[in-house]
Structure formats: C-alpha cells, structure tokens
UniProtKB/Swiss-Prot annotation:
GO terms for molecular function: NAD+ nucleosidase activity, cyclic ADP-ribose generating; signaling receptor activity; transmembrane signaling receptor activity; triacyl lipopeptide binding. Residues 18-589 are extracellular. It is found in: Membrane; Cytoplasmic vesicle, Phagosome membrane; Membrane raft. Pfam families: LRR_8, LRRCT, TIR. Residues 640-783 form the TIR domain. There is a cross-link at K755 (Glycyl lysine isopeptide (Lys-Gly) (interchain with G-Cter in ubiquitin)). This is Toll-like receptor 2. The record marks F350 as: Interaction with bacterial lipopeptide. PROSITE patterns: LRR (PS51450), TIR (PS50104). Residues 611-785 are cytoplasmic. Ester-bound lipid substrates are bound through a crevice formed between the LRR 11 and LRR 12. Residues 1-17 form the signal peptide. Interacts with LY96, TLR1 and TLR6 (via extracellular domain). TLR2 seems to exist in heterodimers with either TLR1 or TLR6 before stimulation by the ligand. The heterodimers form bigger oligomers in response to their corresponding ligands as well as further heterotypic associations with other receptors such as CD14 and/or CD36. Binds MYD88 (via TIR domain). Interacts with TICAM1. Interacts with CNPY3. Interacts with ATG16L1. Interacts with PPP1R11. Interacts with TICAM2. Interacts with TIRAP.
Length: 785
C-alpha cells in the first residue's frame, strides 16, 4: 500500500513540474493594437491558445509546431495573414481553416506535409497568396486543390526531392493566376496541358535540374505567359527540336536564366529555341556558368530571324571557367545587330572586339559595370564606326585611370550623350579634355578627384561628382540643370551665377554650416535642393530663415529629418525646425548695446548724484583720512601739543590774531593755540598739516562766518574735524559765531557739526563790549573741559 502511495506522489510531482516548466503559449505572442501578432522563433510546439477575432495577422514561423487542430483558429474570423513556414507541421485537420474566409495570405512552406487536402483551402475564398514550397509531397493530390481559390494571384508549389509529377488537374480553376513558382527539381512526369488552364499569367519561376520537360511546359504556357524564369538548371544536355513546337506565336516577352549551366552546344539550342518562338524582347542571364570557349556552332545563322527581335540583353555575374581560352564569339555577331540595350555586369569583360562593336548598329545603351576595362582596350572597343547609335555608356567600377584618355577614346561615338565612369580611380583632373560633342550627362562620383576643372564639358545638363574630395566648385556650366555633389568637403553653396539654369542641387553630407535666403534666391530656377546631413551652425539668422520660410519645405526634399544642428552645443543633434534659442543668444548685439547704454546712464546718474550730494567729496575725504590713519604717528596720542586748533577764514584773521590770540595766549595760565599761518610746517602737504594739527590739539575752534563758509581751506578743516568726531566719538569742536549765520549755510554733509549746532550751545561773539568778558570766560571754560 505504501508503495502505491509513493508511486502516486511521484507521478503527481512530475506532472506538476511539467506544468510549471511548460511555456505559456499565449504569452509567447506579442500583438500590437492593430491586431498584428508576432510569435516567430519562440520554440512553440503547438498553436497558441486564446486567439480571438481581434487578430489580423499571425506570424508563427520558425517554431516547432507539428499539428493544427480544428479549433486552433476557429475564432480568428478576421485573420488576413497567417505565416507558418519553417515549423514541423505534419498534420492539419480538415476543418482547421474553416472560419478563415477573410484570409488573404497563407504560408505553409518548409514543413512536413506529405499529403495535401483540398478541404483545407475550400473555405479560403479570399486567399490571394499561397506558399506550399518545401513540403515532402509527391504530387498536388488526387483532387484539384485550388479550384475554389478564384482570387488566388500568387502560388508557390513543389520541393527539391520528392515532387515528381504534375497532373492535368493540378492547376484547374486558377484562371487569373498572376505569378507561379514551381520547384520541379526532380520532376519526372508532366501530363500535357497541365498548365494550359492558366490564362494571362505574368510570371513563372521554374526550378528544374534537367531540361527534359522544359519545352513541354513552355508550350503549354507560351500563349499566356509573359515572363519565364528558369532556375538552377543544367542545360549542358539541352537539345531543341523544332518539331516539338506546333505553336510559334507566343506572349512571352522576357526569359530569365538564373544559376543555369550551359555549354557551347547547349547555348546553340537556347538560341534556336528563342528564335523559334516570336515576341521575346528581353533575355537575362544571372549567376550563370558557361562551360565552353565561345565556339558557338550555329548552322544556318541567316535563317535565324525572330531572335533579332530581342531588344534587351542582360548578363550579370557570368562565370566562364576557361576564361583565358575564350573565343571572340564571332559566330553570333550577326545576331546582335538589332539589340538596343546590353548590360554585361561583373563578368570580367576587358575588351569588346571592334568587329562586334561595329555589328551593334542599333545599340543605344551599353552597361559594362564592374569589369576590367582600361583605356587601351576601350579604344579598341570604341573603334571607328563602333556603336553608331549609342547614347548611354556605363563604365562604372572598371580600371580607368585617365580622364583625358577616356574622353579622347570616346570621340568616335558621335551620338553619345550620357557617360557613367563612376567608381574609377582618376584622382586628378586635367585642365582641358575632349569629349563627344553631344554630351549631356556625366557621372564622376566616387572617382577620388580633388578638384574640378575646365575638363568638364560645358554642354552638360546633368553632372554627378558626389563622394569625392572636392572643397570648391567654381565651374561655369551655363546649361547645367542637375548637380549632384553630395559627400564632399564643400563649405558653402556653389555660386549661382555660374549655374543659371540649375533646377536640382543635391549637396548633402558636406562641410556646409549655413546658407542664407539671399543664396537660395540667387538660384532663380532651382526647384529641388537636398542639403541635409551637413553640420549646421544654428545661428539666429539661420533659424529665422529656415523656420519662417514656409515655401522652403517644398524645395528641401529631405526637410526636416536630415537637417540637424551641430552647434551651439546645447542643441546639437536636434532638428533645425525644432530649435529655439534664447533672446540673449539671438539679440546679443542689441543686448550688449543696451547694457552699454544702461551702464553709461548709470555712470552719468552716479556722477550727477555724486555732484548733487558731494559723493566725490566723501570719497576724497575718506581716502585722505584713511591715508592719514595709515601713516605712523610721530608722537603717541597722549602727547597733545596744543590746547586748541583754530580754524578761521583769512578774512577773519584780524579778529583771531588781535583778539582771540591775545585773550587766550596771554591769559594766566596761557592757552597754547595752533594757527595755520604760524604753526603749519613749511613744505608739508597742507592736508597733512591740517590733520596733524587737529590730532595734536585737544579742541578745535571754528570761527564761523560767511567768509568761513566760502573758504575752501576752512571746509577742509571742517571736513577732517568731522572725521575726527566720527573716529573718536568726542566733543572736541567749539563753534564761535563771529557773525550771525544761517544753519543752511553749513553744508549738509557736515551732519555731525549741524547736529552739534542743533543740540549743543555754541558761542556767539557779542557786539556789546560789556558782554565780551563773559564770552572769553565761557570760551576758556570750554577749552579746559
């Protein structure tokens, strides 16, 4: 019994643990408000639960889902797109898609579906895109899969290994299919007319290793197909027989051979096939390999007529293993006379034989980009009578090194108007060059040139010199309409007077820091300007111009996203249209002028106030007093030499010398007075004499009169006495009114003296002789106090 309980407990614990470790499927989805749900690469092993009608798009690709049940998508009635590619799905229940009548995009590619059921697709009446590639089915089922998909426009079916047969019912009902991709790499059986039911199909991509059934498939689609692309096919065994085709009138306009392997012999078969069906205008070879030497044995070349209708031939990345043994292809020269456009890109072309160039009589466009052309071999290719109708020549990314020689080489091309020689290493440019006289377009981008000179033809209407090392553009090109000069080192816009017809200017990613309204207005015909990606200095003038000109946004095609401030530093990286500078930054001159004016007015006001309230006097007196205080004293402060210092006007000297001195110095005991006329030290600064005399006197007697108030030196003596009153906080001043004087006559700056006159008794000289004795008694008492 205990063992049973123990076993049950262990099973319960394991079950709970597995539940805890199992991921929450619904939480593995991230959905936005529009109903787009992303569940890619979440290691899901089953369909998420809780899917509702709110889901519009569901991506569950790159997971580990193996099974889709009837109820998994039941509520997704509004689902438009369902991506389930790259899972391990091997089972889909019959009614799994029953409610997906709104579904337009379904991708079930690269799963493990070995059997396809028509019941899956029957409810999908709105389906436009269906991808079933990479599943291991052998065929498309016993019953028509797609007969109910009347709105289907793009269909992809097949696989590399197991898809071996196409039956006549497989594509029934797909009347209006636009694009079809079939991976028939291992196709072994094709029932005739299996693709015949498809009408007006635009594009068929057919992947097949061996071309055994190629002609049969082509015949069924020839009357409805416009573009056939053949992929990953080994055409080395391909042989075409005219007897295999009954209908020669086709709708096919373009053939593309992608990653196809051909030999000299099989190439002949391709040419015969293209000749036998009329209407082909364009042939394209991409990433193909030619196992041969160019020895194309084409019998009855003169009978090949329809291939002459081909107007465009494109060859990209052609690999020729025996490249250095390759012939000149002279056997097919006559087939090229009516071709108008040829592109041979990245295929190691170093020479176009002169004879071939002369046969290309209708050629208007030739692109030899990413090859090995040099001036010497280009001269042979552009020989006399070569490419007589050529208008556009593209020699981008070859090995050209001299602009002068390149231009001279092309002089034989009388109708040449457009030349692209970008991504060659010219480095320098001569002062003069010769070019075909009808030149209208020249592309010199990415050629490492440092300057542009008169080598540029004046007949140009379009010039591209972008991605070089130019720091100046000063060419006079009177007919130029478009100038592309981005990714250089220009610091300013070109001079508009040199480009009077300019319509388009692209000058982004240079060293331009600003441009003005005047500069743009000087380009009278300019319609388009692209100047983003420069390091703009967002000055007030630049911001005002760019933000206030509403019409500027119509001219600047990359505005505002690519217009960023580089300085000032606090707005670096911000879009020009969003930057706002402060008043101090935008009106600095006015601000400085205002501050200067305010400072001037402040100084002027200060001077007026100083003059009105004797401010200069206060400062002068304070300075003098401080200087005096800093000087070392000749005698200690207690060594007083005089009883009183007498301050008086020269006009009152008679009264002082004959009355005051006589009454005080001849009194017993005598008083010692200090008079400036008698006791000042000769040669000493007068202010120092005044200060020293006041400091060496116990009292200071001021003989006040109208003359005293008007005397300049008396004012100084009053001044320093005034400072002494503040400094010592004493009552050392004795005022004698020699004659009546109003208090207003004493300057208000002598506030202490005025206060003394208001609060203390002063001596007034009596005119009555009887009262004079009392005056002298009071004076002597005041001096002794």
């Amino acid at each position: 019994m205990s063992r049973v309980l123990w076993t049950l407990w262990v099973l319960g614990a394991v079950t709970n643990l597995s539940k805890e470790e199992a991921p929450d499927q619904s939480s593995s989805l991230s959905c936005d408000p529009t109903g787009v749900c992303d569940g890619r690469s979440r290691s899901l092993n089953s369909m998420p639960s809780g899917l509702t009608a709110a889901v519009r798009s569901l991506d569950l690709s790159n997971n580990e889902i193996t099974y889709i049940g009837n109820s998994d998508l039941r509520d997704c009635v509004n689902l438009k797109a369902l991506r389930l590619e790259s899972n391990g799905i091997n089972t889909i229940e019959e009614e799994s898609f029953l409610s997906l009548w709104s579904l337009e995009h379904l991708d079930l590619s690269y799963n493990l579906l070995s059997n396809l059921s028509s019941s899956w697709f029957r409810p999908l009446s709105s389906l436009k895109f269906l991808n079933l590639l990479g599943n291991p089915y052998k065929s498309l089922g016993e019953t028509p899969l797609f007969s109910q998909l009347t709105n289907l426009r793009i269909l992809k079916v097949g696989n590399i290994y197991s898809f071996t047969e196409i039956q006549d019912k497989d594509f029934a009902g797909l009347t209006f299919l636009e694009e079809l991709e079939i991976d028939a790499s291992n196709l072994q059986r094709y029932e005739p007319k299996s693709l015949k039911s498809i009408q007006n199909i635009s594009y068929l991509a057919l992947r097949m290793k061996q071309p055994v059934l190629l002609v049969e498939i082509f015949v069924d689609l020839s009357s409805s197909l416009k573009h056939l692309e053949l992929r990953d096919t080994h055409l080395d065994t391909f042989h075409f027989s005219e007897a295999s085709i009954n209908e020669t009138h086709t709708l096919v306009k373009k053939w593309t051979f992608r990653n196809v392997k051909v030999t000299d012999r099989s190439f002949t078969g391709v040419v015969r096939l293209l000749n036998y069906v009329s209407g082909v205008l364009e042939v394209e070879f991409e990433d193909c390999t030619l196992y041969g030497l160019g020895d194309f044995d084409i019998p009855d070349v003169d009978k090949i007529k329809n291939i002459g209708q081909i107007e465009t031939l494109t060859v990209r990345r052609l690999h020729i293993p025996h490249f250095y043994s390759f012939y000149d292809m002279s056997s097919i020269y006559s087939l090229t006379e009516d071709v108008k456009r040829i592109t041979v890109e990245n295929s190691k072309v170093f020479l176009v034989p002169c004879l071939l160039s002369q046969h290309l009589k209708s050629l208007e466009y030739l692109d030899l980009s990413e090859n090995l052309m040099v001036e010497e071999y280009l001269k042979n290719s552009a020989c006399e009578d070569a490419w007589p109708s050529l208008q556009t020549l593209v020699l981008r990314q070859n090995h050209l090194a001299s602009l002068e020689r390149t231009g001279e080489t092309l002089l034989t091309l009388k109708n040449l108007t457009n030349i692209d020689i970008s991504k060659n290493s010219f480095h320098s440019m001569p002062e003069t060059c010769q070019w075909p006289e009808k030149m209208k377009y020249l592309n010199l981008s990415s050629t490492r040139i440092h300057s542009v000179t008169g080598c540029i033809p004046k007949t140009l209407e379009i010039l591209d010199v972008s991605n070089n090392n130019l720091n100046l553009f000063s060419l006079n090109l009177p007919q130029l309409k478009e100038l592309y000069i981005s990714r250089n080192k220009l610091m300013t816009l070109p001079d508009a007077s040199l480009l009077p017809m300019l319509l388009v200017l692209k000058i982004s990613r240079n060293a331009i820091t600003t441009f003005s309204k005047e500069q743009l207005d000087s380009f009278h015909t300019l319609k388009t300007l692209e100047a983003g990606g420069n390091n703009f200095i967002c000055s007030c003038e630049f911001l005002s111009f760019t933000q206030e000109q509403q019409a500027l946004a119509k001219v600047l095609i990359d505005w505002p996203a690519n217009y960023l401030c580089d300085s000032p530093s606090h707005v670096r990286g911000q879009q020009v249209q969003d930057v706002r500078l402060s008043v101090s930054e935008c009106h600095r001159t006015a601000l400085v002028s205002g501050m200067c004016c305010a400072l001037f007015l402040l100084i002027l006001l200060t001077e007026v106030l100083c003059h009105r309230f004797h401010g200069l006097w206060y400062m002068r007196m304070m300075w003098a007093w401080l200087q005096a205080k800093r000087k070392p004293r000749k005698a200690p402060s207690r060594d007083v030499c005089y009883d009183a210092f007498v301050s008086y006007s020269e006009h009152d000297s008679y009264w002082v010398e004959n009355l005051l001195v006589q009454k005080l110095e001849h009194f017993n005991p005598p008083f010692k007075l200090c008079l400036h006329k008698r006791d000042f030290i000769p040669g000493k600064w007068i202010i120092d004499n005044i200060i020293d005399s006041i400091e060496k006197s116990r009292k200071t007697i001021f003989v006040l009169s109208e003359n005293f108030v008007k005397s300049e030196w008396c004012k100084y003596e009053l001044d320093f006495s005034h400072f002494r009153l503040f400094d010592e906080n004493s009552d050392a001043a004795i005022l004698i009114l020699l004659e009546p004087i109003e208090k207003k006559a004493i300057p208000q700056r002598f506030c202490k003296l005025r206060k003394i006159m208001n609060t203390k008794t002063y001596l007034e000289w009596p005119t009555d002789d009887a009262q004079q004795e009392g005056f002298w008694l009071n004076l002597r008492t005041a001096i002794k106090s």
